[in-house]
Every structure is written in C-alpha cells, then in structure tokens.
Amino acid sequence: MGLLSACGGLSESRQIPRLTQENVNSFIVEQKKIIRENEDDAEAHFGLSRGYLLKKEYESAEQHARIATRIDPLNPAYYEQLGTALYALQRYSDALTELGTATDLDPERVSAYLLLARVYEQIGDTSRAIAVLEEILQRDRYYVEALFFLARLQLRQHEYDSAIRVLDELIRLEPSNREALLLRIQAYSTQGSFYYARTLIEEMIREHPDYQPLQLELLRILFSQGQWGEARTLIKNLESGTKANAEISLLRAYLELNRENFETAKTQFR
C-alpha cells in the first residue's frame, strides 16, 4: 500500500506539494526551518511527518504527527497521518485509536476509513474490514481502491458472487484496470467456472499479451482441467520470456511428474 496516499488531508492554508524521492529532502529542510522559527507550527510538523513517512523513517513520522495533533487537536488529517505512521510501525491497536479519532472528527473522511480497513485486515478481522469498506462505499460508491479491496476480501471469504458484482462495478468505472480484470477471472476460476474464466482470459490477453499474472492464471486453469499439452506449451513460452519464477518451476515439475518423467522433474529443484 502507498502509505503517503493513505493520508489525504492537507491544510487549507498551506498546500503541501506532492512528495517524491527527488524533492523530499529539500522539503524536510524547509519544514525544519519553519519549526525552528515557530515550534508550534502544526502544519510544518504534519509536513515533516509526511516527509519522514516517504523516507520510511516511521518513528520520526509518528513523533511529528503526534506533535501536530497536540497543537491542533481538532484536525482529522493529523490523526490520520499519525495512524498511518503507526500502521507502518505495525502498532495496529494504536493505529485503530488514532484513525478512529480521525473518522470521529470527519465522518466523511474515506481515506481514513480505507486505512482502518487495512488495519483490520492485518489483525485478521476480515469481517470488520469488509464492514468498514462497505461503509466507505455508502459515502463514495465510485471509490475504486475500496471496491478492489472489498472484492479481494470477499474472495478470501469465498463470497464469490458478491466479489464478482463488486468487480463488475469497478470494471464499469475503469474498463482497462487489469488488476480488476484479473481478479474477476480468478473469482470465476476459484469457484470452478473454468470455461467462463478462460473466455475472459482470451478477451483480456488480446490487450495485455505480455501480462505474466494473466498467463499464470491461465496455466493454473490448464492444470485444474488436466490439459497437460497446452500447459506444457505455455510453460515453455513463459520460461523463454520471463525471469526465473518459482511457481512456474513448481508447475513444470508437477507436469513432468504427471508424465512420469521423474528425472526431469528432479532437475527443477536442484
């Protein structure tokens, strides 16, 4: 997950630029200069926290986000930023507290709800994560990231029909979203609808002929259907055009074992 994108709130009076690896160091220097002149500048502490977050200096990011909340305890963006830093530090219980404060202060703050869902996923509470995502979509039904996240969790819960409905809506919004297209294919293949999954793969592969995850999904379907000849041909194509891939090697070994070619299979594990 892009942690910087999780914290969407910016101060109304001072716009923080889009931070990149190229400008983050100079931005941090600027914020430190502001703080030296006024140590109670909450926006500068907030900006400094975001800079440290990009540099993966998470403890410093937490420290300055916490200072910002103390200076301005009613700004939901600061609590979301603090929750983001705590999430990066894997302090999930603390993250839930701060993100809860952010959403209490601003119930329409969907970016904070999205991070809440990620925290619940990390602690294994998938049902709560799904509930949070559904709440997000009540506020913004076109939030693509939430739609994709929800579909992925629904698949994990074996809620195939629900996941497919969500993915259909997402693909209607973004017809070229290949991650969503692939996840819909996986939803059909996981529930055993191999024929329709292959039909979708054939449609998608015309636009994305070199998309390896799509080819791997086709390979899994071929194995599930016992179509060894097609699987062998596809494995050869994948091996000639990609870097070493553990899953491809494992599937080739299984294929060779199925063909009772034990010596060839054994070479895949040397």
Question: Which stretches of residues belong to each language-model region?
Answer:
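Register position in tetratricopeptide repeats
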Residues: 54, 88-89, 122-123, 156-157, ...
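N-terminal leader/linker segments that initiate helical-solenoid repeat arrays
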Residues: 6-66, 70
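Structural marker of alpha-solenoid helical repeat scaffolds
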Residues: 37, 71, 105, 139-140, ...
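Canonical positions in the second alpha-helix
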Residues: 33-34, 67-68, 101-102, 135-136, ...
